[in-house]
UniProtKB/Swiss-Prot annotation:
It holds the Pfam family UPF0231. This is UPF0231 protein VIBHAR_03438. Belongs to the UPF0231 family. Coiled coil: none annotated. InterPro entries: UPF0231 (IPR008249). HAMAP family: UPF0231 (MF_01053).
């Protein structure tokens, strides 16, 4: 997973761009976590729990996007896709679904979080 951090110094805003197929990870980091040190600490605690209990699923539910860690796999998914019932969707929505969920290895995810902290000087 490739990513880039962008700082708008005039507006004091921070942006995350992730490689194709991982856009939702950037949206999650930017919208759900942002610059909040408490939320970043919460993500780090979840990662620690995942390393301590890799056979369990660890979840951080956000307002629109959630994070799940199971073993060495990280899944970031829009909450709208987490419904327990299946809805028949037309094929033109498949591309949208692909942008609404992404997975990566836990090591890549840890690198993303550490570099985000460094970028924000937290």
């Amino acid at each position: 997973m490739e990513f880039e951090f962008i700082r708008n110094t005039l507006m004091g805003e921070y942006y995350v761009k992730c490689s194709m197929g991982h856009e939702i990870v950037g949206r999650w980091l930017q919208e759900e976590i942002g610059k909040d040190p408490a939320k970043i600490a919460q993500v780090e605690a979840l990662i620690d729990q995942a390393f301590s209990s890799p056979s369990q699923e660890h979840r951080l539910t956000g307002a629109e996007i959630s994070l799940m860690i199971h073993g060495d796999e990280v899944l970031v998914q829009e909450n709208a896709l987490g419904h327990e019932y299946e809805v028949e969707m037309e094929s033109e929505f498949d591309f949208y679904d692909a942008e609404s969920t992404a997975s990566c290895g836990i090591e890549d995810f840890c690198t993303l979080i550490e570099q985000w902290k460094d970028f924000l000087n937290i």
